[in-house]
Amino acid sequence: KGNMTLAEFEEQQQLLAYFKLAEIEPSKQAGGGSAANTMFTFASLGGKPFYACRVGDDAQGEFYLKDLHTTGVATSKKSVHTGSVTGSCVVAVTEDGERTMQTYLGTSSDITAENVDFDALTQADWLYLEGYLAMTESIQPAMIKLRQQAGIHNAKIAVSFADPAVVKFAKDGLLNMLGNKVAVIFCNSEEAKLFTDKKQIKAAARALLEHCQTAVVTDGANGAIIAHKSDDHSEL
């Protein structure tokens, strides 16, 4: 309860079948995901985001892309992979407000450079990368090319660590994503401490400035700490 569990396609179908037997029908279907939610919020604030992803040529994939387009998030035809199954997440919410999730990644776990429209970056001011991609080996060549293209077109890079598990199990992938340095890092206090090996949030935020110009570290009910480096000094 309260956690997210990864599942295979058959396990996802078994769970849905169980809910059906228990006469529990899905109350809502909606697009989601770490980076997709960020793009949705950005579009809601008046931005014009482009989102690179990978879905199947099935009903769920069609719904997902339509949901993004309706909210003002642009995508590419390269996002659709023929003959594959779109990932999904079953979210059960109990009366106490706890969310328990089972996620089937589907074809999204096989995203490669073929699913990325690099031309979209030529008109972008920012390139936003989510930390979960650090755990996907097939996307690493595209990550390198995206960083190179961002440099060519003077686009700033922002990276979200996404989850403590990413820092624990894919730190090398995160370091590859960060390269020499990025403009902004977004993470929570646990992720910041894990990444920097610091015990205090302020020390962790300052240590992150070795990899970025600005670090935004959220801390639950305590709000957030923003560390910024300019010239030869840093400030919180």
Predicted regions and their residues:
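Ribokinase/PfkB-type carbohydrate-kinase core domain
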Residues: 1-8, 26-30, 62-87, 91-236
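Glycine-rich phosphate/adenosyl-contacting loop at the front of the ribokinase-like
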Residues: 1-50, 62
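Phosphate-handling active-site elements
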Residues: 46-52, 232-236
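Alpha-helical transmembrane segments within multi-pass membrane transporters and channels
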Residues: 54-56
